[in-house]
Every structure is written in structure tokens, then in C-alpha cells.
């Protein structure tokens, strides 16, 4: 959104410059002809309006020629107070106006009237807040934070003000094609059935030495209070972690080349083929029931956790590793009859059968060969061999439109989404159950928020007390907690999550600085302390309380003491420039 605003402002400035070159501005909308004017009144022209952007109650000067008979100035349909007037300049006070757009500036018409004619010129009026309409509710938008958190990745915090249903919304926006950026689901403690706090997953996975897990959100719904089983399926590194309990659920899909998709996935029934005989498997990584054959891998735990009533066979791939959408050749390593709880060696799997299904395994011996296959089919894309998938529920946003999958209750919510060209990934958490701060949203409202951010496709993840967003070295006391679950700081342990990973080495050298606050809002005569982050070349925050920053501000706006700004001037808005060792950042200031 910040980039869109900058692009919009640049286009506006170019347009204003083109208008300033023009000698006159032609009359429009009912302006009377030059000929036959009453009392021989001379035509007047508007050359420019300066400054180019101001806010309500600021003074603006309309420059031109022949204003002697001008008696009224309107901004859209609202009359402005004239401070002074001459033949070539009219000074007016901008009237109070309501922003009607989802932007900090809105193009309005400035009309200067004389007794018999008027001239009109477009003007970009600056507003302290944009206005966003969510279904039938109008919200005042305030961007509280916007800063980098990793390769091609930014965190944005937005407050949507409303008397009855205020909202606090958190976004992580990521350039999928950014260098050194990977995406990966995380299983709680790397084992099915466990739970773990999202804010602990990032540091734990980073400590394993496979990149910096710098940002993520909670994942799938799970059997809370029971066995904590994931409900909608998950795969990691070409291994099935858990099969979905429903078909055609929404999935975040990560391909080997790093491409990401959101689509509804269907799983074929897993099967093994031995000696030309195909045997369907009843489950993967689930408790074995009577007359079943089940495959277990290391995500289930160290052993199969079975009794001694069946047959178990340890198998390993003959080449490479386990994979999805492929016939994976395997070799029997060892067999166990009437013995359970078999250990699952690294890189291997265990086939376990009871009752009528035992015969298939009883016929096997060490060295025997076979193949394993499970196919994942997407509804809208031709998938090759996905590396990771995270299943959730059906899509809430598809092709830029909310779907019929709706939960109408307002709750804290979590969402994952992609832009239409799949170049931008969005993680979102909306706080809820937070009195007077954030009421939560329905799934349709969540879909519309994702669409406003830029997503064309999105789904709803586990919400309520599970909704958690993490970003490395920022947030609450540097813990990475970006939102406030149920309005507090307690984070629920969850079964899995989805993370962005920076495939870079540690580097504490500061290459850029960023303000923790996107906008400073302060009352006249009052002060506001500023906080800055040190950002390395990969976009990661390496110092979350940077002190050696020099600040500069126009005296017309206020004064600086250390890292504190005081609104002592008459100017109502402007910027503070922060500089450190040749790198700088700017912070908006609004004086109320």
C-alpha cells in the first residue's frame, strides 16, 4: 500500500507540473462564454494552487489572473473562508471535508466563482486518514507500522476505526521471487500430535541451521484438547505428515523450484506395488486399526507405537528420498512378525499391518523391492512434484471474489493469500475479542481485507485464540509476537504453522534503518518518542532499538531532542528525517 501511495503521489505531481506549464485553465461545467459577459467583466484564469497538498484548516493560495470580481471559492461543494484577495491571488482556509476514498489523498475540484463565470482546477487534498468500506461499514484507516522484516518482506499494522466494530489488522507482504526467500510449513516440535507456540517455532527451526525462519502465522485447524491431530492434511519434504479428513480442501503448495500456489487439493489413496500386485494403504501416520495397513514415517515419532498383534516391515527408498506424485522405489530393510513398536530409522518408513492385511507384509523379506505412490491433484493447476503442502479449509477468496464458504461470526482470524500472478504472498492476522480495539471479522470480511491488500486467492486458517503472527526480532518486547491474541499476550500452542525462511548467513551489519512507527500523531505542544530498527542487507532486523540516529525536522513543524519530537510549530503535518551513517528514513507527522 505504501508503494501504491508513492506511485499515486508521483503521478499526481507529474499531472500538477503539466498543468502549471499551461497558460490558462479552460472553463468547464456551465462556465459562461467569454463573449457577452455582464458589465463587460473580464475573464479570469487559475494558474496554480500552492502548496500542492494540504489538509483541512490549512491556508492555501490560488494563483492566477483577473480575480478582482471573484467572490466565492468552493472545494467540491464546500465553501472555503477567504482570508485575502487580490487580482492575482486568493488566499483561503481549506474547509473541513470527509475523505471518501481508500487513500490519504483525494482529488477534488476547486472552483473560483465571479458573478457571471467560474473556473475549475483539480486539487489533491491531503487527509490524515483514508476511508475503507468493509461490506456496509465505513472505517477510518490508520497505518501504524510498515517496515522490512526479511528478504522482500514487509510487516504492516493497520488500525480501522469504527465506533462499534474497530479492527486491528496485521499483514506480512512478501515478494515470492525475492532472492534468498523460501516458504515452508512447520510442524510443532517436528512431530505429529505435538503443539508449540508460533513465536517459539521460528527460533527453534532457525537453531537447526537451515535458514532464518523470520516470519510466520499459525496454520491448520487441529483436534484441540484431543490428540492434536491436524485435520486438513500436511506434507513436508515430499513426505506425508497427515492425510486430510476431508477432500478438496484449500492448500498452500510449495514446489521444488520455489513457486507457490493456493488451490484445492485432492489426495489419491496411497498405495504400494510389490511384484506387480497393488495394495492400497488405509492410512499414513495414524493409529492402526484391525485389518489395516498403515505407513509410518519419522513425523509420527521414533517408533510406530503399535502392539504386537501385527506385522511390520522397514523400507527405504532405493534412490533419493520419498516424494509426492511419483513412483518411489523402495527396498525392504527388515521385517518383524508378531512384534510392534518398531523403530523408524532416519530416511526410512515402516509398513504396519494387522488381520487380513498382514499377508502382504508376511510375504516380504529383506532385499525385496516395491514402489510407493500417492498423487496430489490440484483443482486449477497442473502440479509436478510438490515439496510442501499445508491444508486448511475451502477457499474464502477465489479469482478476486469472496466464495460461498462463509463463517458469519466475528472472531480473530488468520489468512494466507496470493496475488493473481502468484508473485506476492500475504499473511494476515486480524485481532478479535479485544474490547474497544478489535472486534474480529467474519470470513467474508477477511476475504475482502485480503483482496484490499492485493490477494486474488486466499483461505481462512485456524482462528480464535490460535491466531498468531510472528516476525523475528520485533513485536512485543522483541519476542516476535506481532498481534495480541484475544487482546492479550498469551499465545496458544498450535499443531502447525506456515513460515517464510531467509536462506542467508547471519549478518549483523546495518544496511538500512526503519522507523517502528509509520506515522506520528501528536497534539500541539506534546511530544512523541521515536524508535528505530537496524536492517541488514537481507532485510532482516538485526537491531530492534537503534540509538545512534540523527533526526531533523522543519522548525515550522517542531523540535527534536535526542529521539523525541515535540510539536512546537504551526505546521500541521510534515516529515522527520532520520539518518545514520549515510542511510536515512522518513516518518510522517500529523499534529492534531
What residue ranges belong to the model's regions?
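Ser/Thr/Pro-rich low-complexity tracts
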Residues: 31-135, 585, 589-591
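A short beta-strand micro-motif common to beta-rich folds, especially ectodomain repeats
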Residues: 106-112, 571-580
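Beta-strand-rich structural segments
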Residues: 526-540, 576
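Low-complexity "stalk/linker" and mucin-like segments enriched in Ser/Thr/Pro/Ala/Gly
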Residues: 77-84, 552-564
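Short flexible loop/turn segments that cap and initiate beta-strands
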Residues: 538-557
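Extracellular/luminal low-complexity segments enriched in Ser/Thr/Pro
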Residues: 92-97, 560-575
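Zymogen propeptides
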Residues: 33-40, 126-348
